[in-house]
A protein has these predicted regions:
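Conserved HGGG/HGGXW glycine-rich cap/lid loop of the alpha/beta-hydrolase fold
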Residues: 3-43, 89
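Active-site signature of alpha/beta-hydrolase-fold catalytic machinery across serine-
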Residues: 21, 82-83
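Active-site loop/oxyanion-hole signature of alpha/beta-hydrolase fold enzymes
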Residues: 35-69, 85, 108-112
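Gly/Ala-rich beta-loop-alpha elbow adjacent to hydrolase catalytic centers
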Residues: 71-76, 80
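Flexible "cap/lid" loop of the alpha/beta hydrolase fold
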Residues: 85-90, 94-132, 162-166, 190-191, ...
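Conserved alpha/beta-hydrolase catalytic His-Asp/Glu region
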Residues: 127-173
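Conserved serine/cysteine hydrolase catalytic core
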Residues: 159-224
């Protein structure tokens, strides 16, 4: 049986670069992987870039492979939910501190049931049709346990996120594939109470004592969990 390729999907304001350290760990273990750049967060993104556009990009990348495991971080979880029904050889979904909206919910709406304000909320700034992040607060929200060198580098990579992508509702139905949720207990971006709600929508869950970005702060431990999930 062919080993699956791990298709890594970043969250808001990110890019394929967020998987730098986890990708190195997967490569070291001879695990095939690829990472997607979502169109809602690329430089020069069109303001009318929606969740469906991000999902379409994921499906294109995934369907160029054989069997795949989709791995989504933060907003990337919403993208996985939207893309999954169009991925031909999907084996499993893995969510990392991610949003798992129900049918008809947007990424933004999926967290409203839990009234929990985070450092990320304080960091967000509106710039026309985009959201940007104030750097000092973004570091605390996203990278507080990643080490200064990594965190400061990551801050230079962040890009504006289209508001449309976060506000557009999920339109695809659930798929018949197991799902695995990784909760991050020290997260300053997606409150743990939100993660617990999202994890309850998945088949299984595990926990890391990490901030929002374990792909940087503890890539080996995260890799262990992702591979154990399959």
């Amino acid at each position: 049986m062919t080993d699956p390729t791990y298709v890594l999907v970043h969250g808001g304001w990110g890019g394929a670069w967020v998987w730098r350290d986890l990708g190195e760990e997967l490569t070291r273990r001879e695990v095939p992987w690829t990472a997607v750049d979502l169109p809602s967060a690329i430089h020069g993104a069109h303001p009318n870039t929606f969740l469906a556009d991000d999902a379409r990009e994921v499906a294109v990348v995934a369907n160029a492979e054989g069997p795949v495991v989709l791995v989504g971080h933060s907003y990337g979880g919403a993208v996985l939910c939207e893309a999954a029904q169009d991925v031909t050889h999907l084996q499993r979904l893995v969510f990392i501190a991610a949003l798992v909206p129900l049918l008809g919910e947007s990424a933004t709406e999926s967290v409203r049931e839990v009234q929990a304000r985070t450092v990320l909320d304080e960091a967000i700034q509106v710039d026309g049709d985009f959201l940007t992040l104030e750097p000092t607060l973004a570091k605390k929200a996203l990278y507080q346990d990643c080490g200064d060198e990594t965190a400061d580098w990551a801050l230079t990579q962040l890009t504006p996120q289209t508001i449309a992508s976060l506000r557009s509702p999920r339109s695809s139905f659930d798929v018949d594939a197991p799902s695995y949720y990784v909760r991050c207990t020290l997260d300053n971006a997606v409150d743990l109470s939100v993660q617990e709600l999202m994890a309850a929508r998945c088949t299984e869950y595990a926990t890391l004592e990490s901030g929002h970005s374990p792909m940087f702060s503890m890539p080996e431990a995260l890799c262990d969990l992702i591979l154990a999930a399959t």
